[in-house]
Amino acid sequence: MPRSASLTAPLKVGIAVALAVIPALVLALLGCQWRVTLFWVVFLPCAWLLWCWRRTLMESPERLFLFLALPTGLLMCAFMPTIVSVSWDGYVHYKVANQIAQGEIFVTTGADAINYDMDGIYVVGLVPWGTSDNDWDPNWQGILTEDGMEKANGRFAELGDVTYKVSDGSFAWGVTTMGRIPNALGLWLGDLLGAPYLLRLFLGRLTNLLFWILLVWLAMTRLKSGKRIVCAIGLLPILLFEACNYSYDPWCVGFLLLGFASFVGELQRPEKPLTLGGALWILVPFTLGVLIKAAWIPGGLFLLFLPQKKFRTRGARVLWILACVVVALGVTWTFMGPFLSRGGSGYSDSRGETLTSATVNIDSAEQLAQMAENPLRFLWVLVVWFVGYLNPWPIFEQLFVSFCYLSRPVLWPLWTVGEIVLLALATSCDRTQADDGWPSRALRIGAIVGIVLSYCLPAISLYLGYTNVGADYILGMQVRYMLLYLPLVLLLVLNLGTRSRAWVQRRVLGPVAERLPERWRPAAQNLADVFAALQSLLAWVMIALGFLVRF
């Protein structure tokens, strides 16, 4: 029996407290940076408790996820640069979240004026505007250094005391607005507590993180197996990074993940007919998630292939299909309605409106006319774009370990390989007999077709409203958009049942275990042990390499 197993619970907790307090005192006396001190104060107790509770955490993916996501997420929120544009369109998300928290007439500060500006980094960064031909990258590379954080935080704290009221008539509730509610809750709480600017900003990030953790945890509870797939997705560096910032992507991906998991959970219980509650667990999260990026609605095609055996009667299945169609039409109208009401004129993507220069010619109506005049030409443009979008190198480089404008961490290729191996291990091995039989050919093909269409429709939208008229390319489709349907691919499309688990254990884990010392062989052949060890390692590597070692 391991020595830690014989210790009482109070003693284990007492040792964890000591592992937090003693390093804090020692590192403070040595004058270490606060980030280094905070990392060890959190990491050492967590590492000790992980060892003490390893059997419980290994056998429960839900607990393992919470045990890893909460401390690493909190550290990421604390280490994040103050400027909100560190994440994709963070300045837009922050302003809307502020307006939700305070209303149309809201109190703003001089610091907010910086955070509302896409180029605010030049105000708080180390390199002034115009210093060189490329002063954007050096500013982001230096923002996490000790000097960079000290200057930025000092500037924000100084300007955060300068307040004035603003009436912004441009704010209006829309379908995408709700995606900023988690951030807004933290800002509202900061106002309620009278928190200083930097703390208020932290609270907005914290509530978004907690909302993401809640959605991922709920998704795991809906499944009989495949929970480790969801755990690995929930701890992907790019997704946790967005959850710790001002972004509506955690809302979108999180609700879609919950909808997908609920759907797969129903398939894993073929003996239980679909109930009203079960249907709502699928349709409500899916709708809330896809509303944020409505052009991705074709990806819901898989919903129509829920097998007849899940319904008590044929009429019940007809009602299910009608409900899915109503959801699809409603979501489609949220982006097609405004476009059609303008007669197809102007821009269909608001980001296109910022591209106003002599070299830019963006007009949806004119673009649509050219597409109708020569549809085969546009079809070729779409095919070429889609093939390029599936280029493995950008996917490897940007989909797993990406912190937006921050410079790439050291060893990021090796780190990315680790994330891919973890996802592959969970996808192939976290399968039970509950996964055998239900992935019918029709369901799998329907899901694949829906996913392909869900990326073609946004591409068409971006061609209409974000790309020059008559261009032979499509702008605006980012690799990170693949995260929307990545959970569906791993949970459903790539489900081979227990066959894949048996193959990996026989051909991969078994041979690896034979090369290890005898005492380690049982753990090396156990999926739960291998997954928990690799997931824990990658979660803490995310903080160490992402925010400490490279500086």
Where are these regions (language model features)?
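Perimembrane helix-loop-helix junctions
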Residues: 262-271, 297-329
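Membrane-lumen/periplasm interface segments of multi-pass, membrane-embedded glycan/lipid transferases
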Residues: 337-434
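Interfacial juxtamembrane loops and adjacent helix segments
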Residues: 104-201
